[in-house]
Amino acid sequence: MPRVPATLYACLLGLCALVPRLAGLNICTSGSATSCEECLLIHPKCAWCSKEYFGNPRSITSRCDLKANLIRNGCEGEIESPASSTHVLRNLPLSSKGSSATGSDVIQMTPQEIAVSLRPGEQTTFQLQVRQVEDYPVDLYYLMDLSLSMKDDLENIRSLGTKLAEEMRKLTSNFRLGFGSFVDKDISPFSYTAPRYQTNPCIGYKLFPNCVPSFGFRHLLPLTDRVDSFNEEVRKQRVSRNRDAPEGGFDAVLQAAVCKEKIGWRKDALHLLVFTTDDVPHIALDGKLGGLVQPHDGQCHLNEANEYTASNQMDYPSLALLGEKLAENNINLIFAVTKNHYMLYKNFTALIPGTTVEILHGDSKNIIQLIINAYSSIRAKVELSVWDQPEDLNLFFTATCQDGISYPGQRKCEGLKIGDTASFEVSVEARSCPGRQAAQSFTLRPVGFRDSLQVEVAYNCTCGCSTGLEPNSARCSGNGTYTCGLCECDPGYLGTRCECQEGENQSGYQNLCREAEGKPLCSGRGECSCNQCSCFESEFGRIYGPFCECDSFSCARNKGVLCSGHGECHCGECKCHAGYIGDNCNCSTDVSTCKAKDGQICSDRGRCVCGQCQCTEPGAFGETCEKCPTCPDACSSKRDCVECLLLHQGKPDNQTCHHQCKDEVITWVDTIVKDDQEAVLCFYKTAKDCVMMFSYTELPNGRSNLTVLREPECGSAPNAMTILLAVVGSILLIGMALLAIWKLLVTIHDRREFAKFQSERSRARYEMASNPLYRKPISTHTVDFAFNKFNKSYNGSV
């Protein structure tokens, strides 16, 4: 389903809901307006007749009617019906080139000033155009993280200025470069604060024992066209060391944005702020860990030495404050971060307008190409931002980009080339009158541009006849003021001509206070006095009408809210604000909430009803019908186009391929970038067993950017003998390797056992002993020769 029918469906839904209401009800007469100003507020089609004698003298509402009805009833020439209008006050033509040295004569947006006069409920429309001119001056401020982890990056950008200037001067002849650095707040727990670390926080760190003291932000080089000064300043820098992983870079970003004179931002130049880091940032409320409870004031705090003096006094800035100050000073922030933190900073870009994020290599060697890519991305996009929009104004945008197709609800164009013009239709509507403030203004500005459109707003909330007041007029019996064909009675008097006093007995005319015979006086919600109803007051709202039959609180509710908070209650029926329809105004006609990430309405698988997707494709589900397991995937749908292009030698304008490639912008390349975060990479095998590769990205305008290889990748057929030899050789090598491993293990085991034996042997200790079974061959006997026969003694020896 294409996008236009989805938008058309929403419009038809609104018309279908509105036609029965207009056909069956004249909202002007049912609104029970009691004055010209009230009549104008009911509906932009309502008009007031200021003729003295007109219509039913008892019915004020007969004066408030459609203009055609008033003319038909004889009120010609005295009708109050102001219309909304637009007047262009200043409209300088767009420039084609940023030719001057300062760029002060370059106009990239037209018109520059418009005055609109608005009647509540009625839209007025004006056109504006934006162009990215060629050769526009560029100011680039390089803001670098000098914490210890960025040491190798610092080494690699020593000559960055020269190389970067060479590349940028291919894009603009007027280029200037500046430099600043940051680490973190010099307080605990963000930095090392012990006395021994004050002069050298790297003490005790073996890998890099010497570094400079920690600091918040230092502005080192104002914007200059002397790139040698940049190189010289970079060569002077040394890294420092902080304590925790996050860095204090957002402090530095804010100072670089608001210290315009110190940095040297030119008024008429494209402002680029390159933020390089390898870690996450501290944000608002982190400062409370260090006792910093004062929120950041968003002001410049650089001293004479260009150092940030409030680093240890105020908290880190919030994302909202950063976005405000960057937009206020027309600065495009480029996050150059390492791959592991890419998604975090990618999410930041959705919260901070005008920011882009690129992946920085670990050693910053790709920084030049990164900056060139970011510059090209910024120059290829135009997005309108609204400043100081009054609360009672509704704005509606329709973008017409380079393809000439209108996209309702969109205020951004992408994929532009330098010199392309993006057109926007802006519709302005006042929901109500602002009260005392009769005139207001707001500004439309493309993100990152100095050009802007100032819109002065005046409200048509008063009638011309109100200027001719007649106090104590004879037309009002001397008891009131005559204005716009009516009498405004003084206190205590009633009647169309103020002819009655309150409290007079008019019982004979009480039937004039009944809406119909048998109905209660003044619908039971008022008193009949002087032949007319005086309605009671109610804590719920206003009771009004000739017979007090109407009120402002008896309309349909949604979740307990009258008219869903998107309309006004008039006599039992909701009058919806612009952008809402339905009996209780709960149905939004805005289709922006139905846009999928690829920019398509309901992922091209459903329709947008009341701001929500109703999936019509079988199997599709999700908030924007983005999930569909049974649907053909995007690669399959794009494959038909690619195959047709290959068959017809890459000619997308070929009649045969026109149907398959009607929404694709074709780019032929020799190699596909596989790490592109935004692109979807697709493969398929051709009939010749070759691999065809292509990638695509969905553009916001509903088209696809299709990047296709010029030739499929075809590998040569494998050699059977080579495969056989490789298999046999592999088996032999594996077998020999296993045998060698086995032999090695056995040898190691034997050596361990032998060493164990030797160790035990050396520790052994033996005791001397004789064998009890062993007898010596020689025996010795001693004889006593003084042997006495009787005394059995012998003394001697043998």
Swiss-Prot record:
Residues 1-23 form the signal peptide. Ca(2+) 1 binds at residues 149, 152-153, 362. Gene3D superfamilies: 4.10.1240.30, Cytochrome c1, transmembrane anchor, C-terminal (1.20.5.100), Laminin (2.10.25.10), ligand-binding face of the semaphorins, domain 2 (3.30.1680.10), ntegrin, alpha v. Chain A, domain 3 (2.60.40.1510), von Willebrand factor, type A domain (3.40.50.410). Ca(2+) 2 binds at residues 184, 242, 244, 246-247. Its main location: membrane. InterPro entries: EGF_extracell, I-EGF_1, Integrin_beta_N, Integrin_bsu, Integrin_bsu_cyt_dom, Integrin_bsu_tail, Integrin_bsu_tail_dom_sf, Integrin_bsu_VWA. Keywords: Calcium, Cell adhesion, Cell membrane, Disulfide bond, EGF-like domain, Glycoprotein, Integrin, Magnesium, Membrane, Metal-binding, Phosphoprotein, Receptor, Repeat, Signal, Transmembrane, Transmembrane helix. Residues 27-76 form the PSI domain. This is Integrin beta-5.
